Design a protein with these regions (language model features):
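Conserved donor-binding/catalytic core segment of Leloir-type glycosyltransferases
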Residues: 6-7, 178-206, 218-224
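Glycosyltransferase donor-sugar binding loop
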Residues: 41-45, 190, 217-232, 250-251
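Donor nucleotide-sugar binding/catalytic pocket of nucleotide-sugar-dependent glycosyltransferases
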Residues: 135-175
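Nucleotide-activated donor-binding/catalytic signature segment of Leloir-type glycosyltransferases, i.e.
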Residues: 231-252
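Short alpha-helical donor nucleotide-sugar binding micro-motif in glycosyltransferases
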Residues: 251-252, 259-264
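Aromatic "clamp/platform" in nucleotide-sugar-dependent glycosyltransferases that forms part
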Residues: 272
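Short hydrophobic beta-strand element within catalytic cores of glycosyltransferases
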Residues: 289-292, 302
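A short, well-ordered alpha-helix in the C-terminal region of glycosyltransferases
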Residues: 328, 335, 342-356
Length: 378
């Protein structure tokens, strides 16, 4: 008999990393073949802007989700409950309730598995209330993390024997990256226009490159946010003297987004904080070398000096205090801008690493193996 698993996860909309992985799990034939799977959508936000907000409507929706979970546990009697919780802040407090109730409703202890698509425990663990909650939250659970670097985030509360590692994957679109022949190399930023993504440091780095006489075209693809309005972004480009070597095209999806990866020579993500961004996997799929911060699990994606460059040191950074150094960022980008052979070599290495480790097929295989192993050993 197949193990019965209740998957309590986030599904789109809105579209973000965790919800996309949730959709991959929900739609996976391998998961359905291996397990008697039932699903509850934990999402209460209607848009990206709605994430983290409160209100009576969302409270009512949350209560409905709890009723749905309780009913599924009582009627389906799953062997395991799988939950994708948030790790810090007000979203964590909500998911704390979900996880603790799941533990209570399950007849046996140790039958809840937590799959984290984010990080942040280490940033809150010194607070008295959060520390008390984390100690209860992580008791009698199994944990899946996106990569070994992220164990640092939870090691205060979880023994590594109760942790499994499952890197995300994305569908292999069969992209055959061609050598990009541009008179002026193109740098791609593909994420929301936010300060916490390292926007201002990146603009500083681009200004340095321009002052050095290095030629480039920097494309910005992503939505505007409350952090940076359209007027503020336009002003920042003007102040940095970048209007003649940058373009902002807004959000792009599907083939339109792929067109920018196809033409990019370098992909940048100098974020203050990340977990395991799927956009880096997309860049690798298209054979684009990556320059990114050493935050969260990015070092498990990018081989420093092999498939791109990491900035911020060799040790993965878990706190939210990191700020990328604009000079270091400029130097790494310049190295790739001025060395075509290095760009091509790193791009090919990234494509190979993607095919070996980060396809959706590889993710599904790892995911099913982990859940099967946990079910067998428990």
């Amino acid at each position: 008999m197949k193990p019965r698993v209740l998957f309590v996860l986030h599904l789109p909309p809105p579209v973000h990393g965790a919800s996309m992985v949730g959709k991959y799990i929900h739609d996976s034939e391998k998961v359905k073949e291996a397990f008697d799977a039932q699903f509850v959508n934990l999402t209460t936000a209607s848009s990206l802007e709605d994430i983290g907000k409160g209100g009576w409507k969302k409270l009512w929706s949350f209560c409905e989700k709890l009723r749905e979970i309780r009913k599924a546990i009582k009627t389906q009697r799953p062997d395991w409950v799988y939950v994708t919780p948030n790790s810090a802040g007000s979203p964590f407090y909500k998911d704390y309730v979900v996880v603790q109730l799941c533990k209570r409703w399950m007849k046996e202890k140790g039958r809840v598995m937590l799959h984290f698509h984010n990080k942040g425990v280490q940033t809150r663990q010194e607070r008295w209330l959060d520390d008390k909650l984390y100690r209860r939250f992580f008791k009698d659970v199994k944990v899946i993390l996106l990569g070994k670097p992220l164990y640092e985030d939870v090691k205060k509360y979880v023994e590594e024997k109760d942790v499994w590692y499952c890197a995300n994957g994305i569908p292999d679109n069969g992209a055959c990256p061609e050598e990009k022949v541009h008179e002026v190399p193109r740098i791609l930023w593909l994420t929301n226009i936010m300060r916490t993504k390292g926007l201002m440091e990146y603009l500083d780095a681009l200004r340095m490159l321009k002052e050095r006489g290095v030629r480039f075209q920097a494309d910005f693809v992503g939505g505007l946010t409350k952090e940076v309005t359209g007027d503020e972004f336009e002003l920042a480009l003007t102040v940095h003297g970048l209007n003649d070597c940058t373009s902002y095209v807004g959000k792009k999806y599907g083939p339109e987004k792929e067109a920018y990866f196809r033409e990019a020579n370098i992909f940048v993500l100098p974020s203050y904080t990340e977990a395991f961004p799927l956009t880096i996997l997309e860049a690798m799929q298209w054979g684009v070398p990556v320059v990114a911060s050493t935050v969260g699990g990015i070092s498990a994606e990018v081989g420093d000096g092999e498939t791109g460059f990491l900035i911020g040191g060799k040790v993965p950074i878990m706190d939210n205090m990191f700020r990328p150094d604009a000079l270091e960022l400029a130097d790494k980008i310049e190295t790739l801008l001025t060395d075509k052979e290095l760009r091509v070599r790193m791009g090919k290495a990234g494509k190979l690493k993607f095919q070996q480790e980060f396809t959706l097929e590889a993710f599904e295989k790892r995911f099913v193996e982990i859940l099967s192993q946990v079910s067998t050993n428990s």
